[in-house]
Amino acid sequence: MPAEPAAGARRRISWALFLAALVSYSWFINGVGGPNPLSRIALTLSLLEDRSVTVDRWVELFPASFADKSRVGDHYYSDKAPGVSLLALPAVWLGDMLWRNVAAPRLGAKACDLGPPTAKGCEPSRVFVLTWIAGLATSALATALGVVLLFHLALRLTGDAAGAAFAAIALGFATPAFGWATAFFGHATAAALLLTGLAVIVLQARPDKTALGAGWAGLAAGLALGGAVAVEYPALPAALVVGALALWRLRGMPAPAAAMAVAGAVLGGLA
């Protein structure tokens, strides 16, 4: 097995992979104004501005493109899993503050002409800019971190830095992950969380793990896998498969450490 590179070299490779991926993803704007991202950003904005989960005013603002919705009584709701909308809250709050106080005043009238032909106006333009920011803070960031995580996972398993870097680059730039990383959908974030859960299990489920360390590792894996399902409900089967792998890998661990790992995973998954 080839010798692993020194810690400094690993950090440099990690930063190079992360920055290359994040800058590449941020250069593109994919799906903004479409039904899927619109449904997600509407929930984020409703939580921030209205302290509500209803999306009525956004349905009224985008009647032609707001297709991903459910109606209960007199109100409309996003029909998407809420996870990615919740994760985007801090970035959208900050982005909206900068948009209102910095970007929009400098752009002047141009700030109201950024939306598609079907939804021109200041408010649609603001929504489209915030959708792009939300995508950067979730899909793009999660995928860039996933690229780095895969590099470290492959490096630990093989000891081959070149092979690990190739695998990470292939994931980030030569698979559909690139496309999903440029859109405010749930796909990329859910995939990155599944990969995180898998990496924690593979790297941390060791016979020499202390009970406390196993508990923290289980908590991290549970949070990642549960988060993936909260972002995209169809991620549940994949999360269950990864969870089954975790149980299988617990066989070689001492009973107290295995019990703590399971308890942490259950707590994290339910959180």
Residues covered by each model-derived region:
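Membrane-embedded glycan-lipid processing machinery
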Residues: 80, 130-141, 166, 170, ...
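Transmembrane signal-anchor helices characteristic of membrane glycosylation enzymes that use polyprenol
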Residues: 10-37, 45-49, 170-175, 227-228, ...
